[in-house]
Amino acid sequence: GLKFKIYEKNNSPGGTWYANKYPGSRVDIANHFYSYSFEENHLWSEHFSQQPELLDYFNKCFVKYDIEKHTRFETEVIKLNFDEYDQSWSVESIQEAQTISEKVNIVISCVGQLNQPKFPKISGIESFQGNMFHSSGWPKEDVISGKKVAVVGSGASAFQIVPSIANRCKELTIFQRSPPWMFPNPKYHEKVDAGKKWLLSNLPYYSRWYRFLLFYPGSDQLLDSLFIDPEWIKRDDSINQENDAMRELFTQAMLAQISDPSLIKKVIPEY
């Protein structure tokens, strides 16, 4: 096989599931699809597992396939230069405060899109005296119980954090720039029952078809709703008939969870 090296800035494998340990952290794609096709796990405890179980799964894969011998932990790549003459890459990294330069033939970037937390530029933020942290840097100690807490943003992480901490806070306020759509998913907090686990483990090809069933509705099945119909009359908030039906489905699912009319206007997107 090919010789390869993995440069990992953290001191352990797991990637996003190593870094994101905030309350309520869990996957938002069904486990039986959000996993390696060559390393199926038929014993997930939940359809959308929480961070500890996901980290355990990826760590076991890391050990089983003997990836550690190819990995340099606590090593951050700071510069890449391509040499046109010999068609190779110069990789500059930092490990234990030392700069290391190496030549390689191929570079594959797997840094992800969300590995560098970005704080909003808020006037006066430097004078704030309370605890302030990004969701990916959630402290180990409890710093929110009985406190007034502000959550900036209402995206995927906020969907998970807010319900998990609301009852512990003295007061919880969400600051939102624009509302996002929330996909209705009745199985989001459900356990995988024993019957499903048995079928996945024992019925030939069932796990493969089940994986496809989880994949298709969130991909190719949605294509018709993504094309702009030039003759569609409701162009202010939808782009075709299928898209409008999906918007209505999402809207009704959100309305079913909200009873405050003033809040409804704040959480239903206008796009």
Task: Place the predicted regions along the sequence by residue.
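N-terminal FAD-binding dinucleotide-binding subdomain shared by FAD-dependent oxidases/monooxygenases
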Residues: 2-125, 141, 154, 159, ...
